[in-house]
Swiss-Prot record:
<keyword id="KW-0547">Nucleotide-binding</keyword>
<dbReference type="InterPro" id="IPR016557">
    <property type="entry name" value="Cyc_diphosphoglycerate_synth"/>
</dbReference>
<comment type="function">
    <text>Catalyzes the formation of cyclic 2,3-diphosphoglycerate (cDPG) by formation of an intramolecular phosphoanhydride bond at the expense of ATP.</text>
</comment>
<keyword id="KW-0963">Cytoplasm</keyword>
<dbReference type="GO" id="GO:0005737">
    <property type="term" value="C:cytoplasm"/>
</dbReference>
<dbReference type="GO" id="GO:0016874">
    <property type="term" value="F:ligase activity"/>
</dbReference>
<comment type="similarity">
    <text>Belongs to the cyclic 2,3-diphosphoglycerate synthetase family.</text>
</comment>
<protein>
    <recommendedName>
        <fullName>Cyclic 2,3-diphosphoglycerate synthetase</fullName>
        <ecNumber>6.5.1.9</ecNumber>
    </recommendedName>
</protein>
<dbReference type="GO" id="GO:0036356">
    <property type="term" value="F:cyclic 2,3-diphosphoglycerate synthetase activity"/>
</dbReference>
<dbReference type="GO" id="GO:0006094">
    <property type="term" value="P:gluconeogenesis"/>
</dbReference>
<dbReference type="GO" id="GO:0005524">
    <property type="term" value="F:ATP binding"/>
</dbReference>
<keyword id="KW-0436">Ligase</keyword>
<keyword id="KW-0067">ATP-binding</keyword>
Length: 461
């Protein structure tokens, strides 16, 4: 985000307060050392006796601005004023009925997208702090929630880019189980076997952390980082990702992917952004609150989990319309995930451990059996629930000769461990994003972002 003058303030006021009351509040703000640049009236007329801007400005001794329609919040003027006056904080001195929860989230989105704090009498939203530390072109992969496929898309994207001779990509990932010191994993050089990851787990590492999955599935260099907590607009409480990103400056790479965690956003400045939206998520999560904030950040939006069993055609159509209304400039690609084992499972009797919902188990079973010549004995959708996963394994382990598992959650310390202890083969499984029809070209959309990131980075020189 652009650096702002944190002491420079835009006040949002209304006509539901008498001017002397509002002026007292403005004076109080300035008594704390802030510089109120402008008063913007955002609605309400009950106590608004005069709309003569010159008279009101003289009373407040401040520039005053009105929208054309006093019954509507002038969102466009809020954004224009932030930019024109280079304010670092928007202070909301309004109240019901002029504003409500939805309106305030809309205002917050505008403020945060423009690098401003948005503050009211009992709330405060801070703009994302991004460190500009990379010496190579970069893109972010962030999401509107957890378990929507960020790591799968990140690995797929890295593999795709790695096929292009112009690029040597790497992935910097932060996770809730990441290392205390940023960790380089040479996915481009080492073979990550179940036994190797089990040894890591036995030493206390979270061997199913995102950067291990990235390294195994993408076969590119990864840097693993940690983060704790995630704010409503994506800021983390603590992370070592900035240090991890800086490490890439000394590596033999020329493109950096910054992978978010859950709905938390990497605090490192990137040239382009890919935002993942889960087709299974409630509509209001995406169109209300800070859903629009994340969607507006995107240059490319990938909607995942668009199987009709998860996201009905009606919902998807509605989602496409609403996302386009929020961010008309972003490319949008709806996708489904399909499993892809990293090793041969031909003629194997398998138990497949996944985070995919039970509603699509029959699709996954058919896909695996038809494409990989195996027999799916059972599928457990409890990879992120250790007790239930343990139960599923115990019920089926005597009937299988291969454990097929995604590399996340309890994949190593439960699924891999139990299978190896029984002398069974363990094969890890990738999830491949596939566009829902030929109208969309996922690979082309991704590579467009990559080349745009390179172009944007080169323009800085």
């Amino acid at each position: 985000m652009k650096s702002k003058n944190s002491m420079s303030v835009l006040c949002l006021v209304d006509g539901e307060h008498y001017f002397p009351v509002t002026k007292s509040a403005v004076d109080k703000i300035e008594s704390k050392g802030y510089d109120v640049k402008l008063l913007l009236f955002i609605g309400g007329t009950e106590k608004l006796r005069d709309t003569n801007v010159d008279i009101i400005s003289e009373m407040f001794n401040k520039p005053v601005l009105f929208g054309q329609d006093h019954s509507k919040v002038p969102y466009d003027l809020i954004e224009e004023s932030i930019k024109e006056y280079d304010v670092g904080m928007v202070v909301d001195l309004s109240d019901e009925p002029v504003v409500n929860y939805s309106i305030r989230f809309n205002i917050a989105t505008i403020a945060l997208l423009n690098g401003c704090m948005y503050k009211g009498s009992d709330f405060e939203f801070k703009a994302l702090e991004e460190e500009d530390v990379l010496n190579n072109p970069s893109y972010k992969i962030i999401g509107t929630g957890k378990r929507i496929g960020k790591t799968a898309v990140s690995a797929y994207t890295a593999r795709l880019i790695n096929k292009d001779s112009d690029f040597v990509p790497c992935v910097v990932a932060m996770g809730r189980g990441g290392p205390q010191i940023p960790e380089i994993v040479r996915g481009d050089k080492i073979h990550l076997t179940p036994k190797y990851l089990m040894e890591k787990s036995d030493k206390g590492f979270h061997a199913a952390s995102d950067h291990w999955e990235d390294a195994l599935m993408s076969r590119v260099l990864t840097v693993g980082c940690r983060r704790c907590a995630g704010g409503m607009a994506g800021m983390v409480y603590e992370t070592n990702m900035v240090e991890g990103a800086m490490m890439t400056n000394d590596l033999d790479v020329n493109l950096v992917a910054l992978e978010g965690s859950g709905s938390a956003i990497p605090p490192v400045k990137a040239d382009k952004q890919i935002v993942l939206v889960g087709g299974h998520q409630p509509m209001e999560t995406l169109t209300e609150y800070f859903g629009p904030y994340r969607i507006k950040l995107a240059d490319l939006i990938i909607i995942t989990m668009c199987d009709e069993q998860i996201c009905s055609r009606e919902k998807l159509d509605d989602l496409l319309i609403k996302i386009h209304e929020i961010n008309p400039n972003a490319d949008i690609v709806p996708t489904i995930f399909r499993p892809h084992p990293v090793d041969d499972i031909s003629n194997k009797n398998i138990l497949f451990a996944t985070t995919a919902p039970e509603s699509v188990q029959h699709l996954l079973k058919d896909y695996l059996e038809e494409n990989f010549n195996c027999n799916v004995v059972a599928i457990s959708s409890h990879l992120s629930n250790r007790p239930l996963l343990q139960r599923d394994i115990e019920e089926n382990i005597d009937n299988i000769d291969c454990m097929l598992t995604e590399l996340k959650a309890a994949a190593v310390d439960v699924a891999t461990k139990d299978a190896l202890n029984k002398g069974l083969e363990v094969v890890y499984c990738d999830n491949i994003p596939i566009a829902i029809n030929d109208e969309y070209d996922l690979d082309k959309s991704i590579m467009n972002i990559v080349y745009e990131a390179k172009e944007s980075f080169n323009k800085k020189d």
